[in-house]
């Protein structure tokens, strides 16, 4: 489970199976990807999906550009394959042509931008109305080749690259500054649904926690970016472990067995240093993209724990609010053996990767029936 609660930022995962190796990817930039999509208008869905699966982006594909390219694709397989490579690029800098060469701001301007960001986050926490939205999650996992002891003897799994495993559509509410799943609306599940990684806190807590942590670490202006709302500023931050509220949890390490033969496990909980970018409007401080990447120590069970949240202007009840429209969560985790009497402290399995893509849409005020759609892919 991967959560962002109000008081402590937590990344965690529950698993009992392990990350497969893939062939060397074909590295392409966003512009080249756009050309590939334009040239593939008559390509079958499965063939185009396979073509995307062999690619790795070298720069960040913006949400706006992703939506445009997605609208041109022939089917679900190619859309999911594009989603996957785009999600993995969200932690990268944008293409060079989206980085203006304007002069760097002076110290006074940087300080004012920081004040704007602080004021924006404080205002968001106070002024965001009680609302409802649909949260649509797509889950991706890989599978390594592994031999392990099972109930009937040695069992082998075959290597698979990152692939779509399922989706989950639920209604969420944000009420009195608390985000929760609306159990009164039946969830819609496809495939195996979404397991392993679950995020919450995109509506405000994650912003407050990161800014509070970053203020105790290092925070500096790093570049300009060209966004859909004009020129954006970027702060890069680094948070040391002793100032961090980012805890990386991994479940489960085997401690031993109970008298009835069932495994007795514990959750590893490690406070982690982390870093990331805050992309925001220098005019009003509104956040457009937040990234977080844990700095795992050598030998850690969790080698990657990253979160990115993209925000955009959204109409709710006739007023415009900056709300989350997309989030990406990714973890790479060593599995631990739960059979054969080998403890997690003495055995680490191969690495398994989990990635979740989450989209928010159909925003409306709590208690109303009018649905306002956002322009999401």
Language-model segments: residues:
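Helix N-cap / beta->alpha transition motif
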Residues: 29, 279-281
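Bacterial N-terminal signal peptides
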Residues: 5-16
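General marker for long, soluble alpha-helical cores
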Residues: 20-100
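Residues in and immediately flanking transmembrane alpha helices
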Residues: 15-16, 69, 375
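Structured extracytoplasmic
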Residues: 91-275, 282-288, 293-307, 312-377
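N-terminal processing/targeting junctions
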Residues: 15, 21, 166-170
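N-terminal secretory signal peptides that target proteins for export/translocation
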Residues: 1-2
């Amino acid at each position: 489970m991967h959560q962002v609660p109000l008081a402590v930022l937590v990344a965690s995962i529950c698993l009992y199976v392990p990350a497969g190796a893939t062939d060397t990817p074909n590295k392409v930039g966003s512009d080249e990807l756009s050309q590939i999509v334009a040239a593939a208008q008559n390509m079958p869905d499965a063939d185009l999906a396979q073509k995307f699966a062999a690619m790795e982006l070298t720069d960040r594909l913006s949400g706006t550009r992703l939506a445009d390219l997605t609208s041109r694709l022939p089917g679900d397989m190619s859309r999911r394959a594009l989603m996957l490579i785009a999600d993995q690029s969200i932690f990268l800098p944008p293409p060079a042509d989206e980085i203006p060469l304007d002069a760097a701001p002076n110290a006074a301007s940087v300080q004012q931008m920081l004040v704007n960001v602080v004021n924006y986050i404080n205002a968001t926490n106070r002024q965001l109305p009680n609302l409802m939205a649909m949260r649509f999650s797509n889950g991706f996992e890989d599978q390594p080749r592994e031999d392990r002891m099972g109930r009937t003897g040695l069992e082998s799994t075959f290597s698979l690259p990152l692939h779509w495993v399922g989706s989950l559509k639920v209604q969420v509410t944000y009420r009195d500054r608390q985000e929760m799943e609306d159990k009164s609306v039946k969830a819609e599940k496809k495939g195996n649904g979404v397991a392993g990684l679950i995020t919450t806190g995109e509506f405000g807590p994650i912003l407050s926690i990161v800014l509070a942590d970053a203020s105790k670490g290092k925070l500096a202006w790093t570049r300009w970016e060209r966004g859909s709302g004009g020129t954006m500023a970027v702060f890069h931050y680094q948070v040391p472990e002793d100032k961090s509220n980012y805890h990386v949890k991994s479940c489960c390490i085997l401690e031993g067995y109970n008298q009835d033969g069932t495994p007795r496990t514990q959750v590893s909980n490690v406070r982690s240093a982390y870093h990331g970018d805050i992309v925001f409007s220098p005019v009003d401080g509104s956040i457009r993209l937040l990234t977080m990447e844990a700095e795992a120590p050598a030998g850690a069970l969790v080698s990657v724990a990253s979160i990115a949240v993209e925000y955009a202007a959204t109409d709710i009840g006739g007023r415009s609010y900056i709300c989350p429209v997309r989030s990406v969560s990714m973890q790479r985790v060593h599995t631990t053996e739960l059979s054969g009497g080998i403890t997690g402290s003495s055995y680490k399995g191969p690495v398994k990767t989990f990635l979740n893509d989450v989209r928010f849409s159909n925003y409306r005020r709590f208690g109303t029936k009018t649905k306002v759609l956002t322009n999401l892919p």
